[in-house]
Structures are given as C-alpha cells and as structure tokens.
Amino acid sequence: MQDQLRADECCKYLKALGEPERLRIVECLQGGPKTVSEISRDIGSAIANVSHHLKQLRFAGLVCGERSGRNVIYSLSPAFAGKAAGKAPLKVLDFGCCRIELGKK
C-alpha cells in the first residue's frame, strides 16, 4: 500500500514536468527566484502561458510563490530542489522515487 501511494505521488510530479514549457520554467528557476515577467522573458513565452504553467507546477508542489507588492516571486520548492554535491550550478529535484538533474548537458 505504501509503495502504491509513493508511486502515485511520484507520478504527480513527473506528470507536471511532462510539458516542455514547464520543464523550461523549472530550469529557469534553478538560477533563483523570478517574477512571471522575468520567466516569460527568459524562456521566450507569453506571460499568460507562463502563468498557466506556473499554476500547474504550484499545484504539484514543485514551485512556490511569494507575494511582493504587486508581483509574485516564484522559486523552486525547497522540498525538492537542492544543490548536487560538488557541482554548484547543478540542481536536483529529488522526489524520493527518482531524482532529476537540471542543467546537466
């Protein structure tokens, strides 16, 4: 039963990352917190499109947002994002069932 719950939870995260635009957003946020406008500019996508995908990433728990005046500053969820040992620019999303390395070429 526990394995089934863990698999279901992991699938939720992987499904959220299954859209190329969402993966680009997560990769963009590995550089640090950003507003929707900054993300939109950095990945070359419309603000409305970025907002839609951020909503899905927030729902899955991969991204969190904090209001700052009129803006919301988005960042990778601390529960999943961390530095890989010895490789400062590389970020890892650790879901417990699997790990995804971002920024590795």
Model-derived features: positions:
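Beta-hairpin "wing" of winged helix-turn-helix
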Residues: 59-68, 75-76
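Short, hydrophobic-biased segments on the C-terminal half of alpha helices
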Residues: 54-55
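A generic structural signal for short beta-strands and their flanking turns/coil linkers
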Residues: 32-35, 61, 70, 96
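Alpha-helical residues within the helix-turn-helix
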Residues: 41, 58-59
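N-terminal helix-turn-helix DNA-binding core of bacterial DNA-binding proteins
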Residues: 9-46, 72-81
